[in-house]
A protein has these predicted regions:
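A conserved helix-loop-beta module that forms one wall/lid of the active-site cleft
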Residues: 129-201
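Internal nucleotide-binding/catalytic subdomain
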Residues: 201-308
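Short helix/strand-bridging catalytic loops that position acidic/His residues to coordinate divalent metals
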Residues: 137-142, 267-270, 325-334
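ATP-dependent carboxylate activation and anion-phosphoryl transfer catalytic cores
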Residues: 255-261, 274-474
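Short, flexible, solvent-exposed loop/turn segments with mixed acidic/basic and small polar residues
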Residues: 7-11, 154-156, 191-193, 418-424
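Short acidic/polar capping segments at secondary-structure boundaries
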Residues: 121-123, 141-143, 171-172, 194-198, ...
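ATP-binding N-terminal substructure of ATP-dependent carboxylate-amine bond-forming enzymes
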Residues: 1-141, 172-176, 448-449, 457-461
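Short, surface-exposed amphipathic charged segments that create phosphate/polyanion-binding patches used
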Residues: 62-64, 80-85, 149-155, 178-183, ...
């Protein structure tokens, strides 16, 4: 397995290119960006996607695959192997890749500038040190600081309603603090490290065993907060251009399993308009604070609504959210033709510190909303795939069909890894997007898609995975 697992890009001499560097699930965002850049620059633009996703086949144009972790495991076990790679590790590998560096140099012989577009800005991305290369997104230094949950809770108390919290340095301090708080925070204690997403490095604890089984080392600084029983986990997607201009795309409801594990979202939110309006207002305030800190671009805010209908801040994600592509597809159908979509708004925020004059924000509780939901099937343990899932269609096209009422319900399965792969725990087997005329039809589509995905996992996957692991030791 070479440094580049797969590539199929072809350079058109009459086209300018930017690079997308990130996971394949956000590939579709770049189509919106290339359309905007083509129009704004009055010349054809396209993109080349550098992704870490190891799949059996790629029904995507202009892709190059680099995954240093999968490459190392493939060399050890001599089997097709797929795994997620941490963002910093991936960005570092891409930044040092001779293949990518040569690609950029080749592009710079034909165009004056190469943009790099990412899902999240990482400090490990250093390709913009090259002359003529720039990041089309937030500053990585600023994003890293703002994504620190401890920094958020300590510095955003005057901006958003933050739960009661404490900061603990090391396991001993964590144990001492929680011993005092168990009798007071009787519904549980949420424990997380400074950087955690989708349930990793976090736990809702009701005793010390819950914590010690999750965290094996004392090297972390921990944030603990009072857990509040709640029914709703709304997430708000937005773009900030400056300290007074924050665009809110809308509110979706997150699906949280096991108390802290994010598996997808549904839209439109079931929350009443007055609560959604409050979420809009809070998110604008958070966005203005982000701008004061130097952040420009797409971001998301997660909240909970407790049993007394009080809104509590959970976190801000100084990056694109998992719902960004779905919101682009939704807004394209609901807003007037020609208004800028989220990637174009981010472009103007980064380059010009403002939004274009024809920006149009959706109203709260927009009439005629498209119903959709997503489900990310992440594996809790190593597995083997013994089934094939063909490419199921274009997500953007499906939203168009739903908006024109050409279909009453539909779901697509995306990024299925493929047949005869060893898949590492923590990897996505695939992603489901369902559309319908109401929430019920969306849930039916998600359930059916999940069954189809799960059917591709080998029944004897535990034995198979153990055999493969044993071979790696031999």
């Amino acid at each position: 397995m070479s440094e580049v697992y797969f590539h199929n890009y072809r350079i058109d001499p009459d086209t300018r290119y930017f690079l997308y560097i990130g996971e394949l699930k956000n590939y579709g965002l770049n189509i919106f960006l290339k359309d905007a850049l083509s129009r704004l620059n009055n010349c054809p633009y396209d993109f080349i996607a550098i992704v870490p996703d190891i799949l059996e086949q790629y029904d995507y144009a202009n892709v190059a695959v680099i995954n240093p972790v999968a490459r190392e495991n493939f060399l050890n076990i001599k089997r097709k192997y797929s795994c997620r790679v941490p963002g910093p590790t991936f960005m570092q590998a891409v930044s040092k890749s001779p293949h990518v560096i040569k690609l950029i140099k080749d592009l710079l012989t034909r165009q004056a500038q190469v943009y790099i577009y990412m899902y999240e800005s990482y400090r490990e991305m250093t390709l913009d040190d090259m002359d003529g290369v720039s990041i089309l997104g937030p500053s990585s230094r600023v994003a890293n600081r703002l994504n620190n949950k401890i920094y958020q809770y300590e510095n955003f108390q005057d901006v958003a309603p933050i739960p009661e919290f404490k900061v603990c340095r090391g396991l001993d301090a964590l144990q001492a603090a929680t011993e005092e708080l168990w009798p007071v925070w009787t519904d549980g204690i949420f424990v997380t490290t400074a950087y955690s997403a989708a349930g990793t490095n976090s736990v809702i604890a009701h005793n010390w065993t819950d914590i010690s089984s999750k965290f094996k080392t004392g090297d972390y600084v921990y944030l603990i907060s009072r857990y509040r029983p709640h029914q709703y986990d709304p997430t708000v997607l937005a773009v900030v251009a400056n300290t007074s201009d924050v665009y809110v795309a809308g509110v979706a409801d997150q699906r949280i399993e096991g108390g802290n594990r994010f598996t997808g979202s549904t839209y439109p939110s079931v929350l009443p308009p007055e609560l959604q309006s409050e979420l809009y207002t809070l998110t604008r305030r958070v966005g203005c604070r982000l701008a004061e800190e130097g952040y420009r671009g797409i971001f998301g805010c997660d909240y909970i609504i407790d049993d007394q209908n009080r809104i509590l801040f959970v976190e801000v994600n100084a990056r694109k959210q998992g719902t960004t592509l779905e919101f682009c597809c939704t807004l394209e159908q609901l807003l007037p033709p020609g208004v800028p979509m989220l990637p174009e708004l981010e472009y103007h925020a980064v380059v010009a510190n403002r939004f274009p004059e024809n920006t149009r924000e959706p109203a709260v509780g927009l009439e005629g909303a498209i119903y959709w939901g997503t489900y990310n099937l992440k594996l809790a343990e190593d597995a083997c795939v013994a089934g094939f899932m063909p490419f199921c269609g274009d997500e953007r096209q499906c939203f168009g069909l739903a908006a024109r009422e050409k279909v009453s319900r539909q779901f697509v399965i995306l990024e299925h890894i493929g047949n005869d792969f060893v898949i590492a725990a923590g990897s996505f087997l695939g992603r489901i997007v369902a559309l319908g005329q109401d929430h019920r039809s969306v849930q039916q589509g998600l359930a059916q898609g999940k069954k189809m995905l799960e059917a591709t996992i080998a029944r004897s996957w535990q034995t198979t995975a153990q055999t493969v692991a044993a071979k790696a030791v031999e």
